[in-house]
C-alpha cells in the first residue's frame, strides 16, 4: 500500500510538471488551430504572416476594468494547457501579449475585433461583454488545435475576426420546478450558455409541482410548497412512485447564481408563473384559490384547473410581496410572469371573480403596473397578448404566429416556439435507447432552420424581435446528465441562429464545425447526444 501511494505521488508530480516541460524545456513543434467554430463569426479574414504561438512567455494584458474578463481567459487557458499566464496591466519590452481592451472603434456593445499575428493577439470589444465574447472565440479556436502529441504547442493562424451578434436576446431556459437541480449544476449550465455566446438564463423556479425559491414573507412556500408526496413514473402514466421529492434555493444561493452569471455577462431572468401553474402556492396558502382548498402540490404533469383567485385582494398582496423579494434578488430589468395555460373554470364559478371582465387581462395588468412602478418590465408567454399593455414583452411558444402578431402590434418579442425550440422533445427518431420525453420530434436540422425574424414580417415588426431562446422543461429530466443530453447539440444549433447572420449559415458547414466543437464539450465533461456521430456511440445501450 505504501509503495502504491509513493507511485501515485510521483505520477501526480509528473502531471503537475508536464505543462512546464511541454512549453519551456522541450524542443516543440506546433499544431495550427483554426476558426471553424460555433457560432460562426460574421467575418473571418485570414492574413499573411506567421501564426501566433501560445507558449509560456505569453502574458495577458488588460486594464483593471477588464480584470474579470482577463481572469476568465486565464482560467480557460490554464484548464487547456496547464499554465497560469500572468495577467498584467503594464506593457513590457520583448513580451508577447494577448491584449484585452474596450475600444470606441467597435460600435456594437456586444461586438469585438480579434486580431491575431505572430507578435501577439489584440482583442477589442465595444464593451466588457464584447471582450468576453471575443474570449469565447479565442478559447474555442485554441480548442480546435487538437495537438497530435505532447510535443506540440497551440497555434492560431494570422487573422482579423470582426464579429457582432444578430440578436440581443440569446437565451436558454431551465425548469427547476418539475425536477430540482443543485446550485453547482445550475452554474455548470450557465457556463454552457457562456460557451455559446448566450446572454440570458431564463430560470423557471415556480410551478404546480414545486416552489423553488425562498420567499421570507410567505414561509409556507418553502415549508409546504417546495415538496411533493411523489412523482409520476414514466410517460403518460398515472402511477405515482410515492417518494417524497423537493428542494428550494435560498435567497443567498440565488444571489450566488446571479453573481456567477453576471461575471459571464449573462442576465438571470426569473419566472414566477401565474395566475395558473400555481398549485404549489395554493397548497401552501389555500386562501389564495377560488375554492379555499384543500390543495396538494402537484405530483403529475400537465395543467391543473386550480389557479390564483383574481377577485381576491389578498392574491395581489401575495403577488406584490413575492415580486418585491424577487426584484431584490434579481437585478434583471425583465421579470417573467408566466401567464400560460390558465384554465378559467374556477373563475367562472367563483363569486369573488364575478364582475371582472377579461379576468386574465385584468390580472396581467395589475402585475404589469406593479412591475412598471418599480422600474421593471413584464414578460409573459404569448397567452397574455390579448389585452396586455403595449410595453408588455411577449414570449411566443405556441409557434411563431403569436410572436409575429405581437411584433406587428408593436410588442417586443422573444421567439421560443415549440416547433423549433422545445429541447425536451426527442431529437432522434429511434427512441429505443432514448430517455422519456415530452412532445414530439425536433431534430437538430429543424432547430437550425429557425429564422426568428423572417422577411415576411414588416421592417417595423422585425425590429421588435429581440431574439430567441430554447426551453428545457424537466418533467422527464430526472438528473443532470439528462438535461445536458437533451440540450446538446441542439442548443449549439440555436446559438448559431441567435448569433450568426442568415446569409452566413449553412447546415452542412455547421455539422463539420459541430463535430470538432463536441470534442471540446467532452473535454469539459458535458453529456451530449451522439446520433450524428455513430462511431462515438455505444451500440444498444443508453447513450449517457
Q: What annotation goes with each model-predicted range?
A:
Residues 2-18:
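Bacterial N-terminal signal peptides that target proteins for export
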Residues 15-27:
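Bacterial N-terminal signal peptides
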Residues 32-167, 482, 497-525, 529:
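Contiguous, structured surface segment used for ligand recognition
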Residues 38-40, 46-47, 54, 256, ...:
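Substrate-binding groove of N-acetylhexosamine-processing glycoside hydrolases
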Residues 68-69, 180-182, 208-214, 275-281, ...:
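Flexible loop/turn segments at secondary-structure boundaries
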Residues 83, 198, 264-266, 376, ...:
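Short glycine/serine/threonine/alanine-rich loop segments
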Residues 107-306, 310-317, 322-334, 366, ...:
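Feature activates predominantly on carbohydrate-active enzymes
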Residues 170-173, 238-239, 341-354, 389:
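Short, conserved helix/loop micro-motifs enriched in His/Cys and acidic residues
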Amino acid at each position: 500500500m505504501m509503495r502504491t501511494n509513493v507511485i501515485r505521488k510521483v505520477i501526480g508530480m509528473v502531471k503537475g510538471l508536464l505543462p512546464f516541460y511541454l512549453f519551456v524545456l522541450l524542443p516543440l513543434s506546433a499544431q495550427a488551430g483554426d476558426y471553424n467554430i460555433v457560432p460562426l463569426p460574421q467575418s473571418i479574414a485570414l492574413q499573411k504572416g506567421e501564426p501566433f504561438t501560445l507558449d509560456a512567455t505569453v502574458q495577458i494584458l488588460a486594464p483593471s476594468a477588464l480584470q474579470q474578463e482577463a481572469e476568465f481567459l486565464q482560467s480557460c487557458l490554464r484548464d487547456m494547457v496547464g499554465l497560469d499566464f500572468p495577467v498584467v496591466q503594464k506593457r513590457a519590452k520583448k513580451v508577447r501579449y494577448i491584449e484585452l481592451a474596450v475600444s470606441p472603434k467597435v460600435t456594437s456593445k456586444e461586438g469585438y475585433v480579434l486580431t491575431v499575428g505572430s507578435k501577439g493577439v489584440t482583442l477589442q470589444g465595444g464593451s466588457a461583454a464584447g471582450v468576453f465574447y471575443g474570449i469565447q472565440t479565442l478559447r474555442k479556436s485554441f480548442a480546435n488545435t487538437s495537438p497530435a502529441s505532447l510535443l506540440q504547442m497551440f497555434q492560431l493562424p494570422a487573422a482579423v475576426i470582426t464579429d457582432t451578434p444578430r440578436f440581443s436576446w440569446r437565451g436558454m431556459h431551465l425548469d427547476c420546478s418539475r425536477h430540482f437541480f443543485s446550485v453547482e449544476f445550475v452554474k455548470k449550465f450557465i457556463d454552457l450558455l457562456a460557451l455559446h455566446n448566450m446572454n440570458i438564463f431564463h430560470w423557471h423556479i415556480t410551478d404546480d409541482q414545486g416552489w423553488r425559491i425562498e420567499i421570507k414573507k410567505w414561509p409556507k412556500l418553502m415549508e409546504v410548497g417546495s415538496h411533493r408526496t411523489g412523482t409520476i413514473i414514466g410517460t403518460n402514466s398515472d402511477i405515482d412512485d410515492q417518494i417524497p421529492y423537493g428542494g428550494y434555493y435560498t435567497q443567498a444561493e440565488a444571489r450566488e447564481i446571479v453573481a456567477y452569471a453576471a461575471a459571464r455577462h449573462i442576465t438571470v431572468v426569473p419566472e414566477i408563473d401565474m395566475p395558473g401553474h400555481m398549485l404549489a402556492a395554493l397548497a401552501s396558502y389555500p386562501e389564495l384559490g377560488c375554492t379555499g382548498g384543500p390543495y396538494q402540490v402537484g405530483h403529475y404533469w400537465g395543467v391543473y384547473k386550480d389557479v390564483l383567485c383574481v377577485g381576491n385582494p389578498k392574491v395581489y398582496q401575495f403577488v406584490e410581496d413575492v415580486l418585491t423579494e424577487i426584484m431584490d434578488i434579481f437585478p434583471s430589468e425583465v421579470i417573467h410572469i408566466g401567464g400560460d395555460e390558465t384554465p378559467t373554470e374556477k373563475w367562472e364559478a367563483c363569486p369573488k371573480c364575478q364582475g371582472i371582465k377579461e379576468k386574465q387581462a385584468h390580472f396581467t395588468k395589475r402585475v404589469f403596473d406593479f412591475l412598471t412602478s418599480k422600474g421593471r418590465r413584464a414578460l409573459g408567454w404569448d397567452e397574455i397578448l390579448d389585452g396586455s399593455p403595449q410595453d408588455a414583452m411577449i414570449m411566443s411558444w405556441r409557434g411563431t404566429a403569436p410572436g409575429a402578431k405581437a411584433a406587428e402590434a408593436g410588442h417586443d418579442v422573444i421567439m421560443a416556439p415549440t416547433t423549433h425550440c422545445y429541447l425536451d422533445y426527442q431529437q432522434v427518431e429511434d427512441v429505443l435507447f432514448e430517455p422519456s420525453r415530452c412532445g414530439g420530434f425536433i431534430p437538430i436540422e429543424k432547430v437550425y432552420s429557425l429564422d426568428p425574424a423572417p422577411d415576411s414580417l414588416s421592417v417595423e415588426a422585425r425590429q421588435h424581435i429581440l431574439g430567441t431562446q430554447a426551453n428545457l422543461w424537466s418533467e422527464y429530466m430526472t438528473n443532470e446528465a439528462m438535461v445536458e443530453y437533451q440540450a446538446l447539440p441542439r442548443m449549439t444549433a440555436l446559438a448559431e441562429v441567435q448569433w450568426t447572420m442568415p446569409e452566413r449559415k449553412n447546415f452542412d458547414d455547421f455539422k463539420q464545425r459541430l463535430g470538432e466543437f463536441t470534442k471540446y464539450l467532452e473535454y469539459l465533461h458535458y453529456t451530449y447526444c451522439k446520433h450524428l456521430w455513430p462511431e462515438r456511440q455505444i451500440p444498444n445501450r443508453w447513450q449517457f
